[in-house]
Amino acid sequence: MANTKSAKKKIKVIRRRTIENKIQKFKMKKAIKEVKKALLSGDIEKAKELYSKAAKLIDQTAAKGVIHKNNASRKKSRLMKLINKYAALSSPQPESKAQ
């Protein structure tokens, strides 16, 4: 346990920041889940719209130092890759000409 007054204050600050970080991380994860849910329901346009909001939250989380910037970039990349995969599956494929 902390002995000095400043150390006790530091514990309070750390607890407050931990809570703020968890809230920010929860918002980010929820946004990602909403995008995935839209994809599973087959609504590609809604998923793309939700992706922009999720990407913004991911960037904010990285800017606040809750997650590393490379982690944020990886999350956005994987999410966009998933959207493109579902978009390719749902769009009709052009027929190739047999030679």
Swiss-Prot record:
One of its GO terms (cellular component) is cytosol. Pfam families: Ribosomal_S20p. SUPFAM superfamilies: Ribosomal protein S20. InterPro entries: Ribosomal_bS20, Ribosomal_bS20_sf. Keywords: Ribonucleoprotein, Ribosomal protein, RNA-binding, rRNA-binding. GO terms for biological process: translation. The keyword Acetylation does not apply. One of its GO terms (molecular function) is small ribosomal subunit rRNA binding. PANTHER family: 30S RIBOSOMAL PROTEIN S20, SMALL RIBOSOMAL SUBUNIT PROTEIN BS20C. HAMAP family: Ribosomal_bS20. Belongs to the bacterial ribosomal protein bS20 family. Binds directly to 16S ribosomal RNA. This is Small ribosomal subunit protein bS20. It comes from Caldicellulosiruptor bescii (strain ATCC BAA-1888 / DSM 6725 / KCTC 15123 / Z-1320) (Anaerocellum thermophilum). The lineage of its organism: Bacteria, Bacillati, Bacillota, Bacillota incertae sedis, Caldicellulosiruptorales. The gene is rpsT.
